[in-house]
Structures are given as C-alpha cells and as structure tokens.
Amino acid sequence: MGEILGIARFRFDEGKLDEYKRLSAEAMEIVKTKDTGTLQYDTYLNDDESECVIIERYRDSEALMEHAANLEDLSAEILAIVTVVHGEVLGDPSAELRAALADSEIPQLFTPYASM
C-alpha cells in the first residue's frame, strides 16, 4: 500500500460554471482545513471552461477515504451540475478502498504494473 492518485474529468452542465467554481472553492477550503492525508488537489479548466480535470494525490487509501467523507455532501452538489467524463483511481488500494469502489463504474481502478 502506498500513495493513491485520482483523476476526475467533468463537463459542466449548461450555465453551471459559476456554481461549479463556487462549489470548487468550498471543496478546496475543506481539503485544506480537514483532510490530513491529501498531498495534492489541483483543478484545471480547459480553454473554453466547459470541462475540468482534477488531479488528486493521497498519502494512502485511508486518506482518500477520509477525503471522500469530508466532501460527501459537497460532492453530491457538484455531481448534480456536471457530467462525469471519466474518473480513475491509481495505486495499490487497501481492502476497504477496493470494497468501496467495487460497485462503482466511476472511478475505475488501475493497479500498478510498471514504474520507475
């Protein structure tokens, strides 16, 4: 077990960019003040601001699960105004994280194959 990476890509529903930006700012504040194992949490917008990519890095599976719990209510609000294009979790997850992801198509889990 070790670091876990997350990649999420959203397309904003029509007219929802400003609401997303407000919710994203709230999420960032929660991450900064409540998460204890989040190492990276970055949001990128494409040129026309119709989509975003979020890059997340966690100390371990427990940290990702803590993050998900901290953002649970806010995540529901965000998911109500976006279409999920894709989501991936990369790493060697704990049994608990693997179980939490088991019934979900998104995010898709990728485990290590080769790295340097």
Say what each PLM segment does.
Residues 73-75:
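A generic local structural motif
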Residues 1-52, 59-70, 80-116:
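Short S/T/G/P-rich N-terminal loop/turn motif that feeds into the first structured element of a domain
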